[in-house]
Structure formats: C-alpha cells, structure tokens
Design a protein with these regions (language model features):
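N-terminal secretion targeting segments of exported proteins
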Residues: 1-16
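Catalytic glycan-binding domains that act on GlcNAc-containing polysaccharides
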Residues: 16-143
Length: 143
C-alpha cells in the first residue's frame, strides 16, 4: 500500500509500505501532515533518531527531482537517515528493508539504533548531541 505525506513545501509524497516494514498507525489527523511530523511520530519512542534525521537530511528522503537523497560528502549515504549502503545495504536487504524507501530507511535506522546506538551517525553528532544529552540518551561518540 501507499500513504500520502506532505513535505514542508506542500508537495504530496507517496510512501510505499512493505510487509516487514510497519508504518506508524498512531498518526491520525484530518489533513495532510508534514514529513517532519511523520518522522517525529515514527521515532516517538527514540526521539534522538528524529533529531539525527533533521541533522542528516533536514527530513528529506528524496531530492527535488525525485531521486533518493545521497550524502554530500559520501554518496553511499542514502535517504532521510543517511544510511551508508557500503556498510549496511546487504544487512538491510537480508532483513527485508529497502533503504531507498522512506519506511525502509527509517525502519532500518530503528533496528540499527537498537543494536549500535547513535554510533553510526557520529559524524553529525555536533548537530544532534545537545538533544541526546537533554533526553538522557546514551551516547557512544568517539572523540
């Protein structure tokens, strides 16, 4: 199935869903929601991941031309959570996650966070670290 989500510019984005990737069922609103709100709701149990998404991609999964967002420094980093395909593509696919979709990218990030904490996103920690400290999150930041 698909769900429509509005980005901050007011454009509608189609979000694909897959059997192994669950959408947030608790988002119940009368009108369109922003993609930021969708991400924050998805990560409501691990709010540091929403802050990481803001720092990594400014809450974007796709470029304005519709292509999956890739990293500015490392083109292997993809999507809203900037998951590095070199390190994670095989594991993500074996687990049933498609990193090129919004739901797959966020669901894999949640799985990665459960096993490795914030370490995979240490490169952007200067941006989100203050939120982790405020939320009493455990940090695994290499100096």
């Amino acid at each position: 199935g698909q769900v429509s989500v509005s980005n901050d510019a007011g454009s509608q984005i189609k979000v694909d869903t897959f059997p192994k990737q669950e959408l947030v069922e608790s988002i119940k609103v009368d009108g369109p929601i922003t993609f930021e709100r969708y991400v924050r709701e998805y990560f409501k149990d691990d709010p540091i991941l929403a802050e990481i998404a803001m720092c990594e991609s400014t809450f974007r999964q796709y470029n304005s031309d519709g292509a999956v967002l890739t990293g500015r420094v490392n083109k292997s980093d993809v999507g809203v959570m900037q998951i590095n395909k070199y390190y994670h593509l095989e594991r993500a696919e074996k687990s049933g996650f498609d990193l090129n979709t919004i739901v797959g990218n966020m669901a894999y990030a949640k799985k990665l966070y459960k096993s490795e904490g914030t370490k995979p996103w240490n490169a952007s920690s200067k941006c989100w670290r203050k939120f982790a400290n405020r939320e009493n999150e455990t940090l695994d930041i290499e100096s």
